[in-house]
């Protein structure tokens, strides 16, 4: 059995720092891939159509789609124009949306968090509430940015896991406490997506892709935050890492067989 660690791609956000544009990924995501999933993180620049997706996927054993301060541009799901001042990242959209679709179809394990969760819904034809706190009957799922990070990322509400679903199998519970740092949320659920968890106000908090043999899970909360201190978050990243290792074994075994032939 190979002892090599799986290579896990993490698409970057594009942002301005001083006068220059940078491609960046939050350290907490990189650390979660390395320490909790047991993979080798590979940062993928947000180059849109310049990314050679087919070639890239041959080099990857998994993909983590992260959260971000930016929102998916609404034209991707036929939504109304965003309010002035809304932060968008069109270069990330142009990279992650086609990359995620291709990865899932190719059987590459995918774990999507927060913005990544929203991207997965859009990829499968779903739509988003841009401000879920303004929807009647929904609670405010945003963090209080005036508080220290420890409090912003603290658990704030429960989510109920679908009976017999993947999350219940992984976490051994029907109810868990999660943090909440989002304004966008699922409006219309995408095709092929199966709900794995909901908040008490009915907001979808997790789903998986139904008809794929590989790991393809998305959560609205942030399990990457202090992941090594949270058994439930460790279980999620552990399952993702296991799927990536299995993908790596299958791919390398196939490559060896091809070389022998």
Predicted features and spans:
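N-terminal beta1-alpha1 cap of cysteine-dependent amidohydrolase-like domains
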Residues: 1-111, 122-124, 129, 133-171, ...
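Hydrophobic, aromatic-enriched interface-forming segments
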Residues: 117-119
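A short, structured beta-strand/loop element
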Residues: 213-215
